[in-house]
């Protein structure tokens, strides 16, 4: 059963009961997933940016947007408009497919994995996790990468509090650390 179907049929009614909500539309849901990668070396090395864009496109299955510097910062040797990273925003079916792959395939492949931190919520029910290596995703072959790079994954929800967001992600199968 796909994650989207499981959310509609089992997770949504269970959360409505657990959070004692009167309307099904009050139940928190995932709005979007943003995958972001900041590349300090992209200012000097254009190949690293190209490789990074290709990797993110493989992982997410969607076109990648190159992020550019808003201001020049001499200390970092960047000028305004220079490419300094890349990002992808996933919504709808692609978002659910990515979350399913992240939870069931990628996260368990992290070395010494004991669960993700339950403290990485932002106060409004959104969750951010950092991944140190891109090779945890099955789409990336270890032989074809030039360097190990990480990424930030932000899961934006309609939850009104961290507790609601945590309940939603726990029901979806997110492996949180137990103290």
Swiss-Prot record:
GO CC entries: ribonucleoprotein complex; ribosome
Keyword hit for RNA-binding: yes
Protein family membership: Belongs to the universal ribosomal protein uL5 family.
Source organism: Synechococcus sp. (strain CC9605)
Matching Gene3D superfamilies: 3.30.1440.10
UniProt keyword list: Ribonucleoprotein, Ribosomal protein, RNA-binding, rRNA-binding, tRNA-binding
Protein's job: This is one of the proteins that bind and probably mediate the attachment of the 5S RNA into the large ribosomal subunit, where it forms part of the central protuberance. In the 70S ribosome it contacts protein S13 of the 30S subunit (bridge B1b), connecting the 2 subunits; this bridge is implicated in subunit movement. Contacts the P site tRNA; the 5S rRNA and some of its associated proteins might help stabilize positioning of ribosome-bound tRNAs.
Molecular function via GO: rRNA binding; structural constituent of ribosome; tRNA binding
Origin organism lineage: Bacteria, Bacillati, Cyanobacteriota, Cyanophyceae, Synechococcales
Recorded name of the encoding gene: rplE
Protein name from the UniProt record: Large ribosomal subunit protein uL5
């Amino acid at each position: 059963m796909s994650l989207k179907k499981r959310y509609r049929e089992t997770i949504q009614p269970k959360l409505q009961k657990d959070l004692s909500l009167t309307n099904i539309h009050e139940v928190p849901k995932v709005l979007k997933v943003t995958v972001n990668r900041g590349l300090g070396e992209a200012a000097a090395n254009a190949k690293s940016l190209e490789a990074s864009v290709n990797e993110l496109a493989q992982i997410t299955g969607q076109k990648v947007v190159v992020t550019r510097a808003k201001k020049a910062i001499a200390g970092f040797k960047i000028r305004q408009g220079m490419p300094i990273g890349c990002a992808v925003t996933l919504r709808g079916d692609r978002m659910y497919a990515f979350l399913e792959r992240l939870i069931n395939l990628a996260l368990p492949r992290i070395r010494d994995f004991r669960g993700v931190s339950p403290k990485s919520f932002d106060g409004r029910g959104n969750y951010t996790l950092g991944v140190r290596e891109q090779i945890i995703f099955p789409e990336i072959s270890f032989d074809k990468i030039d360097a190990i790079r990480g990424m930030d994954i932000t899961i934006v929800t309609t939850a009104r509090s961290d507790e609601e967001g945590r309940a939603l992600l726990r029901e979806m199968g997110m492996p949180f650390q137990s103290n």
